[in-house]
């Protein structure tokens, strides 16, 4: 039996710090466990059973971890939903996941409005609507759990997180893994072993800082793993470069999960600001989610030294890992296969590519990480390959392995835009624009943005009865704002007489996209 696991640590060392909220209010392990247990009892009393889904739309907050830890010890699936989504987008995930309970926040007016629109659109049962702030039609979390005991539940079994990841069809798909029977501490500390890939050890006064939204798969994975490893977690409401340096210095932060956009913003700080704060406590400042320009990473290594780590993985699984020293030998690599993983580069004819030859990147599907796309067996099967009696999966990325086994990415999922570490799928945006009567055809793609990596651009072919004008441009922008999350909104829209398609209707999107990338060091 493992000695790790948040619930064990909370029972044996209840006075240790678990969470530092964005307000810098401190929660001990014992306090966090007490609220977690109350929510567990309340959800079960409400009728949520093992295998059922609890969905959340929450900002970075202690309630995020209370919700996660309650699901994780009860056999529930937690479905974290991006709080930037519009009402119809939230409604789709609530309905598709079959959520029995919905925990939301109204601290931000737009978030409250989107959540209320979502539950109204699908007639979600009001008794299953719980909020962390005052919201019409929702029961406040404090009231929902007020009559419940803080004692550990008698029956405990490990739950799972089911993240939704968009596909080329534009509709999000739930990445669903089977529940693993067993003590939650044992099961969850097994998954927390991912931290060992970055030489992070249990306890040892480690402190993890969260500067990205917790609805991102990896951010919740790494920060919850930190709790199961006996670490403290410092929360930021949103990323602010100087604030992160302040918190690293104050709390002697040792680890974080970051994206290249955050590196860029840190490096943009004046030298006198950077010099004010001591970052020598950092040991594993891990980055992923988007390509990192070589010059940006080199600058971060010069500043933070060997604490800079990188990995390659997906919501579906992974992956590779590389430390600063190895990366410096092979700049641009995303690393070697981590323990237990295997990477293969497969040609279009199904054969294995030779070193330094590009192909589709496939990763071995481990027993503990087997998944299916909820409700889409066709997609599940389509993106798998049996090779040497092992099952591999792909997310469509193109790359190659060098002779030493280091992976280099050349391109990624067809047409996907990565902006500030967030995956944005053009098909969903295109489908939205096609609902407008003026739009005959549309292409959405990413163009360079120095800060965010990429930004969204739309090129629209108008119907015959419409002419391009500033008024129509404003109308289309307003239409997008009403139907899409802010991060998916085009920064610019161009009108075109005819989009480049072949006789079969295939869009030559690269003819539109490539001119913007001609002078860029990377088109990933």
What residue ranges belong to the model's regions?
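Conserved AMP-binding/adenylation subdomain of ANL enzymes
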Residues: 183-207, 211, 215-255, 269
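Gly/Ser/Thr-rich phosphate-binding loop
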Residues: 162-166, 228-229, 253-258, 269-330, ...
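Structural core segment of the AMP-binding/adenylate-forming
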Residues: 45-46, 73-147, 154
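Conserved pre-ATP/AMP-binding loop-to-beta segment of ANL
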Residues: 14-15, 129, 134-136, 143-166, ...
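Conserved AMP-binding A3 loop
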Residues: 28-30, 160-189
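Conserved ATP/PPi-binding loop(s) of AMP-dependent carboxylate-activating enzymes
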Residues: 340, 351-385, 424
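AMP-binding/adenylate-forming catalytic core of the ANL superfamily
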Residues: 41, 85, 91-92, 102, ...
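Conserved AMP-binding/adenylate-forming core of the ANL superfamily
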Residues: 15-61, 65, 69, 86-91
